[in-house]
Design a protein with these regions (language model features):
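Positively charged, small/polar-rich N-terminal and surface patches that mediate targeting and assembly
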Residues: 1-112
Length: 112
């Protein structure tokens, strides 16, 4: 099993969710996060004064998948979240040893 983690722009969430659902992936965890990469934040103007904003609001999407689905899930997220502009995000895949569905005690792929 794999954990596909994506950091995306908030306005792309609906497209990412729909792309993952088309793969049959119906469960995901979404968290509001803040960070920066190469863009190193941005500046905003408030009441005529310019302020530097170091951290940019993003969403972290996490999806547990079977090994053979990971590449398709990554492609789906990338295609749905890409705007072609700085700050589109990152996607990475992490191996997962064990998953347990708390309610039933099911383990492994059955818990997905």
């Amino acid at each position: 099993m794999k954990l596909v983690t994506a950091i995306i722009k908030p306005f792309t969430l609906d497209d990412v969710k729909e792309a993952l659902e088309q793969l049959g992936l119906l469960g995901m965890t979404v968290s509001e996060v803040r960070g920066y990469g190469r863009q190193k934040g941005h500046t905003e103007v408030y009441r005529g004064a310019e302020y530097s904003v170091d951290f940019v609001a993003k969403l972290k999407v996490e999806v547990l998948v079977e090994d053979d689905t990971a590449d398709r899930a990554v492609d789906a997220v990338v295609n749905a979240a890409r705007t072609g502009r700085i700050g589109d995000g990152k996607v990475w895949v992490t191996p997962v040893d064990t998953v347990v569905r708390v309610r039933t005690g099911e383990r492994g792929v059955d818990a997905l």
